[in-house]
Structure formats: C-alpha cells, structure tokens
Regions:
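Short beta-strands within extracellular/lumenal beta-sheet-rich domains
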Residues: 90-122, 165, 895-925
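Intrinsically disordered, low-complexity Pro/Gly/Ser/Thr-rich segments with frequent PxxP/GP/PP motifs
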Residues: 806-831
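Preference for solvent-exposed, low-hydrophobicity sequence contexts
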Residues: 213-489
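Active-site beta->alpha N-cap acidic-glycine motif
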Residues: 483-566
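Extracellular carbohydrate recognition and processing domains
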Residues: 146-177, 817, 950-980
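Short beta-strand-plus-loop segments that form exposed binding edges in beta-rich domains
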Residues: 182-189, 986-993
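Extracellular carbohydrate-recognition regions
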Residues: 42-77, 85, 205-212, 858-888
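Catalytic grooves of carbohydrate-active enzymes
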Residues: 437, 442-451, 519-543, 553, ...
Length: 1007
C-alpha cells in the first residue's frame, strides 16, 4: 500500500523503483512512510495505516476530538448491528444488497457540539461484496440537521477494499453546531460501517480539500430567437397512456437493489406502452393510490407479484435487448433511458448485465469523458426519434419516472451544480451551454418534467433552472420520482368539478379577511408522496378554511389523485391553480430569448394553455410567482379572465391572483389591489425561516400578518403557507392567536368579498403606508387611482397640506373602466402628514398619508445637491433577517425598537440583511440608521447593497467608530446603481463595538 502511495505521489520516481530489490524497496517504503506520518502530526498510526492513499492527506497538526461508534452513537434509516471482530468493540453497522432499501441514510448523527474550526472526519468502512464498478455511498458533514452541507464525497466500490476496513477522510470547515456526519447508501454493494473519528486540523489549507465546481452560468446565447412551433402528434399537452387493464400486476420494488429498480422501471415503460398492466410499489403512498383506483372502478382487480424480478421473464417478448450504462458516468443512465425508449430495451448495470442473457443493444461504458459529451451525442443521434413536446431535467439517480420516459420516448438531460459538477464527468458550464443550444432548437411552450435540483448544490438549482427554462418558453412540471405515471395517465376524466361552495360570510367593515394558501401543489410529488397526503389526514381539516394549490397539469398526469382530493374535500377545502399556470415558470423571464413580438406571443400561448386546463379542473383563482412587472400581472387577468373556454364554461371570469412565494413586498398598502377586469391581486404577507422552531414559525406568521395589515378596514390578506414547514394544527393556532378581528376564509370567498368592497369604493385610491423624506430635500412618491365605477372617469388630484413647492403629474387624467392610473407627487416636506384631495364630479375623497422627516443633523455625510429623492421603501431592522443579534427597546428608534449586536453575545457577521423586495433598475440612495453603543476603534461595520442573494454587490461602505458617536443615531448614506430585481441591504458587524440598527430607508434618485 505504501509503495503504491509513493509511486502515485511522486510519479517521477516510479521508473527508479522498478529495478530495486524487495529489501531495498521495503527500506525506502518505511523511510517514506515515516516522512508522510511526520507531516501529519498527531494522526494515530492505526488511522494512517488504513488510509488508502495517505499522501493525499493534508500536511498539518491533527488533534483528536471525538470517536463515535456506528452502531450506538448514530441514528439509522436502514441496516442492522452485526458482530465483527475487526471492528472497534467487535460490532459494526451493516447494510446489504437485497435486504435494505436503497438510497437511504445508513448513518446520521451524532449532533455533537463542536467548536468552529477546520476538521477531518475519518469514516471506517468495509466493502463486503466484489466491486461492481458502481457508487457505494456518499459521505457528508453538515449542520442545521442536513440543511447546510459542509462537504461531501461520493465513494465508488472501486475506492474500497473488499473484506478490509479502510479509513475515508472527509475535510470540512465547521462554522455552526451541532455537527452531523452521514452515510447515504446507494444500494449497489454491501458494506459495514465501524465508526467515525474526528480530528481538528491546523496549518492546513482546508478549502483546497473541499471540491466544488462553479455554479453553472448561462451565456445568454442564443437570443432573439424566432417563434418555433411543431404540431403535437397527441391531443393534449402531455402524451397519455391507454386505459389501464382491468387487472394490474402489483410488485414491490422497495426491497430490491437500485439497479434492479432502474431496470424494472424501464421494463414497465415498455409493457405499459401497449396497455398499462404493471403497477409498482416504490413510494410509501403508492398503496393509497392503488386502493383509490380500485375504489373508483378504474381497476377491477390486482395480482401480487412475489418477486418483481420475475416480470422480466414474463414480459420477455416486449424486450429486444439491454442497454448497459456506466455507473461511474451519471449521464449514461439518462442516455440509457432514452435508448430504451427508442430501441425497446431495458437499462442494465454492469453487475446485472453479466447474468441477464439479453442481447446488448448498446454498451455505454467508457464511451464519453464527460456528461456533456454524452448528452450532446444523445441529441444528435436520438432527437429525431424522440418526443419533441415533452423533455425532462432528471437527476440520473432519480428513477421513479423512468416508466413514463421510456413509454413516451422523452429526451432527458441534467445540468450539474457545484457538488455533483465536481465529481466524475461533471462540467456545469459545458452542460448549461449545451442545453442553451438545444433549447433553442425545441418547440415553445413544452413542459420540462422532473426537477433541476437534487439537494443542496446538486444540480443547477430550482431558481436558476426555472429561469433558464422560462427564458426559452418552457415550463417545469415538478415530478421527481412520481411513480406509475404510465398507469395514472391512462385514466380519462374530461372535467373535474369542485364541490358546491358554501355562501361567503357577510362583509363587515371592521374585519381583516385572510386566506391560508398552502404552497407547492404544482409539484406532483407534493400531491402524491408528501406533504399533501399527510396534511389531508389532519383532524383540523374541515374546521378551518384552507386554499390548496394544485397543478393544472395534474388532470393529465395524475387524474385519479386529483379526483381523490376533490371527492374527499370538505366545504372548507378549496383548490386554486398553482405556480405559475399550466407549469412552474417565472413570468418576468418567460420567452426572454425570443425576439419581439414573438416573446409576447409565446407568453400569451402559455396563458391560453393555463386557461384551458384551469377550466377542466374548475379553478377560478391562480397562484403565481417570479413576477414583479405590473403589466405581466395584468396580462394574466386580461387573458385568462376573458379566455373563451374559461368564460363559456364558468360564466364568471378569473376572480383572483395570489402572488409570490413568501412575502416579497414591504408596504402593507401595496399587497392587495385590483387589476384588469376587476381581478383581485393578493400578494403574500408571510414568509418563513427554515431554522425556526415550531413555536417560532407560529409566532413569526402571527407577527408578519399583523405587521402587514393595512390600517384601513376591511382588509384582505394572502397568508402564504410554506407546506414543508407547517401543519394544519400550527395554522389553527395562528388563527386562534390572531383573534376575532381576523377572519379566515376560503380563497374564493376572499376574492368575492374584495370585489364586493371594491364596488363600494367606486374610485379606489392607493398610496404608500407612509412617506419618508429628508428635511428640506425634495421628495417624490407615487399613488394610483383605480376606476371601479363601471364607466370612464376623469379624476383630478391636488395636495392640500404637508408639502410645499408641489407638483402633481398629471394633475388630471381620464381613467377607463377597470383601469388604474399612476400619479406622481413632488414637493418639499413641511409637516407630519400629506393630505391629498381627489375629485370626480360628485365624488370627492381626501387621503392622508403619514410623513416622516429625517433630520439633516443625523446625516453621517451630506447628500448630493439638486436631487429629488423618490421614496421607495423603509425597512425596519427588526423585520429583516439576522444571523446574529437581538431585539432591544429604544425610545428614540423609529418603531421604539432596534436590532443590537453586542460583543460577547453576538457573532461577527451580517446582523441585518434583506428584504429581497423588487425594485426597478435605476440609481438609489439607502440611508442606514445606526448607533454605536460602546467604546471601539477602527472599522466597526460595513453596509452594502446587492441584488437579492448577495450577488452582485452594487456598493459598499466601511464605517469607522469615529463616524458614529456613542449613543447618537447617524444616517449613513450609500449610493448605488441597481440593475433591477430584488434588492438586499446588509449590515456586516465586525465585533469592534456594540452596534444598533434602526432601519434602512431607500430612495430612487431623480433629477
């Protein structure tokens, strides 16, 4: 082992070593081993002896921290304790092929409190089987209970030694606690895990050992594409199966190795292409949906297959041969699936291929160097034989949908992220550039199945992936591991109807009406696997009104599942279309790669498809996200509410749009308003934090609802519910704590009540909740008037008090029916309130808006002269996000509270950041109101602005102790150019002095 180490680490010595005698070689080996060991100071010999290649260990000082036994110090999803004389304590944890469920954690824990620093964990693991040239498991270290992975490594069976324990090192930098170490078993080979030993390391460049690829970055080319259409060879958006056989063969795949599961899913696609006959149990809910098929009469009987592998011989006549994939090049699993669909083959691992006795249609081992090369070959050689109207972005190890992919010959691709892009065959930028080229050659408005994310930094990611698809006029129908689509899609339900609605409550002038909108029903696994099936069983359901989001595509792919929800709904359950229509997309980016006016045509066709399938599912409200442009929100209302199918079928048009994935807007007066055809727009007023406890989530939701409630009554609110983090019992507690002033209603009732109130307003005036200005500095702000009169109106505005040197632009305007007109008011602040008068013949309204003047004496630096500051927003520090710090009372603060970071209590870092609110491109000034609370010197903080998410940083300023006198608030100005999109403002605390943050005021600079 040592000799191999020497030759690998110092390749130029290999030739010289070849002529030495065995004795000479041994002496050199011992000498070199001593050298290596000396460089890893503090690492025990028993650990070093079991590292396959110790020369790759970093040079530095090793300090023992802890040792955890696999069988007693960790939790397990699979496996069992076994005796092993070679293991520490004569016991180990074992997982075996054919006995344990693949793709599950064999080990996770121990959630140990460990100080921040650089570490290497050594996993002691033994291979039990002969290597099959496949991945065995993935090791990682993480914090926040798996939400933040510090480093991971994918281990193939060829990296192990059969019958002998070896030490596998994993380096990471720990910044939080408790620490979790995990072993995720792939199910391809049997292994035993003895223990995990942790060492702290010093004098080591640990970041060099954490392998990360760059986040894939699209080039933006090609662009200005022409509209590209190909007629669909099938009548609906998705290809459908034939009706299922009256008798289904039911087989349980869960006990089988992962490669057998993969093979049988491809077989299911071939067999069910002719007529659905095979139904697999793979997910925990597959029995539930099978029972429903029988209860509704779509399937008359079932026959249990004792061993699913027998199906291969039963249906041998359907199979022309096998495609052997290369387990060490992930893309070959996707290419093999495509070849199976085209060639009527099954996909086989090298291990299975040895014993199957099937003709080899294609052997993909060692065919390509990278994943990108494999996908490019597939497009050039297979695209003409594949379906051009559905594609899939599928992680190669997500196998549950392979039946549908094979059945309908679907093109499959994957774009790696920073983690999987650093592994064998990964090249994220090459992969994304290839897909840009391929997307441009595909028809518009086609669905992308599966999902572009497979874990933290695995895959291009949800946001970047959906953005890329949207730019090319494609939408995502999330469907990771949705099984048996080759069965479900054969069930035909021409139209679904929600149960008759109860009457809405009486509109009361002093109430706040709100609807719980439960997220992610666009994602088919949420409907079929989790969390909706579990939430649906809650005893709270039926006692409170809930809005359940659901994909309009579901009626084609999982009609029986939708039928289950509709049939078992209570009068308090209501369904609305999920983001952002027929599929998940970001309307702000939709069709961006196409030339004008083709971009508008592409988007309008997407809306037409959405309207068609909303009609078929009796959906009258729609949840949308990734949309900040008012004209696009209005386009939804114009197109869908007047769409011929929706109008003729339902009589009443689209009633409401529920906008955003969590709270995005910051002004309570901006979250609810009407748009075209009096369609109500309800922006989300609540968000979430993954790290919150159950109680913190309840409190956060209650506080956000109250903070985002306008002062006027009645009020109407969209309460966004992150389905991954809430259950119905928590929402019941939220309703209880809000009290009787707040009335929960169904989403359709919220829309109807709002329309009733809107009709009473006749002319609806919308202003900001407050205006913030700097003393003696011209300020401008916007307001709008919506015409709900039912006839055209001419409206005039004038400022009564609160400003001097006033201009209103325009002073008068004609407003068409169901149209909104924007007005701009400019002036120098003079009071604490701005009074504005609106007149339209007999209708006269006066609006009062609070005005807060910021003192010139608090400015840490003078503002540029000759500017008008258009007030954009005010972000109270307590309502932004924080990595550290705490809330404190302060009578001189804006809201009587500040966010404080104190030495010895808070952690160095961003104590305030957010809010990711959307703003148009332009020049801005942010005023950070800060106060130093203690002695200090040097740089005590940095303030900056950036596009939401931290990149790019648009401006930053370092703040010294001298700039902030102790005990006095100062307004620190930061000027920046914003490219458009979500704005993030941040305060980074250095720990050099105690610091309080009151708010951040944001202004757009105008001449």
């Amino acid at each position: 082992m040592v000799v191999a180490c020497e030759v690998r680490s110092v390749g130029k010595w290999a030739t010289a070593f070849a002529g030495l005698t065995g004795t000479s070689m041994l002496l050199i080996s011992v000498a070199c081993w001593a050298l290596v060991w000396a460089q890893q100071q503090g690492l025990p010999e028993n650990v070093m002896n079991e590292v396959v290649n110790p020369s790759l260990l970093p040079v530095g000082r090793y300090q023992f921290v802890a040792e955890w036994e696999a069988e007693k110090d960790f939790a397990h999803k699979i496996g069992r304790k076994v005796e092993d004389p070679d293991a520490s304590g004569n016991a180990a944890w074992e997982v075996r092929v054919g006995e344990d469920t693949p793709n599950a954690h064999a080990l996770f824990g121990p959630y140990a409190k460990v100080a921040p620093g650089d570490y290497i964990a050594f996993f002691r693991i033994k291979l039990l089987d002969e290597p099959v040239r496949d991945f065995a498991f993935e090791l990682d270290a993480c914090v926040d209970y798996g939400r933040r992975i510090l480093n991971s490594v994918e281990v193939a069976d060829l990296d192990l030694v059969q019958g002998k324990f070896i030490q596998i090192p994993l380096a990471f930098r720990l910044t939080g606690s408790p620490l979790e170490c995990r072993v995720f078993w792939r199910g391809n080979v049997s292994v035993r895990i003895d223990k995990v030993t942790l060492f702290r390391v010093e004098g080591v460049g640990i970041e060099q050992l954490i392998r990360r690829a760059p986040q894939p970055k699209p080039t933006g080319e090609p662009k200005d594409l022409p509209y590209h259409f190909e007629p669909r060879p099938f009548p609906e958006l998705f290809p459908r199966s034939k009706p299922p056989a009256q008798k289904l063969l039911v087989a349980d795949l869960r006990p089988l190795p992962a490669d057998w599961q993969f093979l049988l899913f491809t077989l299911q696609g071939l067999v069910n292409r002719q007529k659905p006959q095979i139904y697999f149990l793979f997910n925990l809910t597959d029995e539930l949906w099978l029972d429903w098929l029988q209860k509704r009469g779509w399937v008359k009987e079932t026959e249990k297959v004792p061993d699913a592998r027998a199906l291969l011989s039963w249906f041998r006549s359907f199979v022309k041969g096998m495609v052997v994939y290369d387990p060490l090049l992930p893309a070959t699993k996707n290419v093999a699936t495509m070849l199976c669909g085209v060639e009527d083959a099954v996909a086989a691992s090298p291990r299975l291929a040895k014993d199957l006795n099937l003709p080899v249609i294609a052997d993909l081992r060692d065919r390509w160097r990278t994943n990108a090369e494999a996908y490019e070959w597939a497009f050039k050689n297979l695209w003409a034989k594949l379906n051009h109207h559905v594609i899939a972005c599928a992680y190669p190890d997500h196998i549950g949908m392979r039946d549908y992919f094979v059945q309908h010959r679907i093109f499959i691709f994957w774009i790696s992220g920073p983690v999987d892009g650093a592994r064998r065959g990964g090249d994220p930028n090459a992969e994304v550039r290839l897909m840009e080229k391929l997307f441009a050659q595909m028809p518009v408005n086609i669905p992308v199945m599966s999902y572009p994310w497979a874990g933290q930094d695995v895959g291009i990611g949800e946001g970047p992936g959906v953005t890329l698809f949207s730019e090319f006029g494609k939408f995502l129908v999330g469907s990771i591991n949705c099984t048996n689509l080759s069965v479900y899609s054969g069930i035909v339900i021409p139209r679904l109807r929600q149960k008759p609605a109860p009457p809405p409550p009486k509109l009361q002038p002093d109430k706040v009406y709100y609807s719980f909108i439960i997220s992610d029903g666009d994602n088919l696994p949420v409907l079929t696997i989790g969390n909706f099936p579990q939430l649906w069983q809650s005893p709270v359901r039926g006692k409170l009104p809930f809005g359940w989001t659901i994909s309009p595509s579901a009626i084609m792919l999982i009609p029986a599942v939708v039928d289950y929800y509709y049939a078992t709904a209570t009068p308090n359950d209501y369904f609305l279309g999920a983001v952002s229509g027929i599929g998940y997309c970001y309307p702000d980016h939709y069709g961006k790669r196409f030339r004008e006016p083709d971009r508008k045509r592409v988007f309008d066709e997407f809306l037409d498809l959405t309207a068609d399938y909303m009609q078929r599912m009796d959906l009258r409200e729609l949840w949308i996200m990734g949309i900040t442009r008012p004209e696009l929100i209005r386009r939804y209302a114009e197109k869908i509410s007047t769409h011929r199918t929706l109008r003729s079928a339902l009589g009443t048009n689209l009633r409401a749009l529920f906008v955003d994935y969590g709270r995005r807007l910051t002004d309570p007066n901006s979250v609810t308003y009407p748009t075209a055809n009096n369609v109500a727009v309800f922006h989300a007023v609540t968000g979430w934090r993954e790290e919150d406890t159950r109680e913190e989530r309840i409190n956060r939701m209650v506080n956000e609802i109250k903070a985002m409630t306008p002062t006027t009554r009645p009020a109407f609110l969209h309460v966004f519910v992150w389905n991954w983090g809430f259950d119905l019992e928590m929402l019941s507690e939220v309703a209880k704590r809000l009290g009787s002033e707040y009335v929960p209603v169904r989403p359709d009732h919220l829309a109807l009540l709002y329309r009733e109130w809107l009709a009473q307003q006749k002319l609806l005036v919308r202003t900001l909740t407050q205006i913030v200005a700097v003393e003696e500095t011209p300020v401008s702000f916007g307001m709008s008037v919506f015409n709900a009169l039912g006839k055209p109106a001419e409206v005039g505005l004038n400022v009564v008090s609160g400003l001097k040197e006033v201009k209103v632009i325009p002073a008068k305007a004609k407003i068409a029916v169901s149209e909104e007109k924007e007005f701009t008011v400019v002036g120098v602040p003079t009071g604490e309130q701005v009074r504005i008068r609106l007149s339209n013949g007999s209708i006269v309204k006066q609006v009062e808006v609070p005005l807060e003047q910021l003192s010139q004496s608090e400015l840490a630096a003078p503002l540029p002269k000759g500017l008008v500051l258009k007030f954009a927003a005010k972000f109270e520090a307590e309502h932004l996000a924080h990595l550290s710090g705490e809330l404190r009372q302060d009578e001189r603060a804006s809201g009587k509270v500040v966010w404080v970071a104190e030495r010895n209590r808070a952690k160095i870092g961003h104590i305030v950041y957010g809010p990711y609110a959307p703003f148009e491109a332009g020049r801005y000034i942010a005023l950070f109101r800060l106060k130093r609370l203690s002695e200090g010197e040097g740089f005590i903080a940095t303030v900056d602005s950036c596009v939401g998410g931290g990149s790019p940083v648009t401006a930053e300023k370092r703040i010294t102790a001298e700039q902030l006198p102790i005990g006095q608030f100062r307004l620190v100005p930061l000027e920046f150019a914003h490219p458009g999109g979500p704005v993030e403002t941040r305060v980074f605390w250095t720990g050099q002095a105690d610091l309080a943050v009151d708010f951040v005021a944001l202004f757009k600079v105008e001449k």
